[in-house]
Amino acid sequence: FNALHGDEGENGKLQAAFDLLNICYTGSGAQGCMLAMNKSLSKQLFRTHGIPTPEAVILSESDKCRAAELCEKLGLPCVVKPASLGSSVGVSIVRTNDEFFTALDSAFSLEHTVIVEKYIKGREFAVGIVGSRVLPAIEIIPKHGFYDYKNKYQPGCTVEICPADIDSDTAERMAKATRKVFRVLGLGAYARADFMVDENGIYCLEANTPVSYTHLRAHETKANLV
C-alpha cells in the first residue's frame, strides 16, 4: 500500500521501480503519477482537453531576466510556484513587483521550472475520486492566509467542510472535471483534484496522487482507520 508523499513517492519513480520488479502496488501507475506531479505538463493537458484551469506562464531559469515581460498579461496578484513540488512548498501569492521577483528567486531555488499563474480569488475545493465514484466536494477554508504548507499540516489552521455548501450545478461541474482529469492523466484507483471557484466558473489547479485522506474523506468512503 503506497502512502508515500514527496518526490519519489508521487512523481512516478517509485511506481516505475515497482513495475520493473513486478511488485504490485496501490494507486496510479508511473506515467499518471509523473503527469500529476508535473504541473506544467498537467496544465498543458488540461488546456488541450478543455478542462478549465487558470491561465499560466511556464518559466525556465533562462527566462528570469524577462519574466516580468512574459507574465505581464497575467497581472497582479498572481501565484508563483515550482512546477513539480507538492504540499504548497515554494508557493507564493504576490501582489507587487518586488514580491514577484522575490517569489521567483524562492521558487527557482527549489526547482528549475516555475509556473506563474493568474490568481483566482474565490473558494477552494478538493474533490476525491475512487474508481469511477466521485466523492462529495470538500471546501477548504484556511483561518489565515492561503492553503500553504502550515495551513495544510498544522492542526486547527484550516476548516474543512464536507459535503461543501455549494449548488448542485457547481458540484456537478467539478465532479465532471474530476472524472476528466482522472481519465486524461491516466490515473488509477484513487486521486484528488483541487479547484478554485469564483463567479466566472470553476478552475482546476492540479491533480494529486496519492491523496491525503483526511478523516472527512475516509468517512465518505466508509474506510476504517486503525
Model-based region annotation:
Residues N2, Y25-G29, P82-G86, C204-E206:
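Short beta-strands and strand-loop turn motifs
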Residues N2-V57:
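Conserved N-proximal alpha/beta basic substrate-recognition cap immediately N-terminal to
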Residues L35-R123, A175:
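Active-site nucleotide/adenylate-binding loops and adjacent lid/helix of ATP-dependent enzymes
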Residues T214-A223:
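Conserved small/polar residues in nucleotide/adenosyl-binding loops
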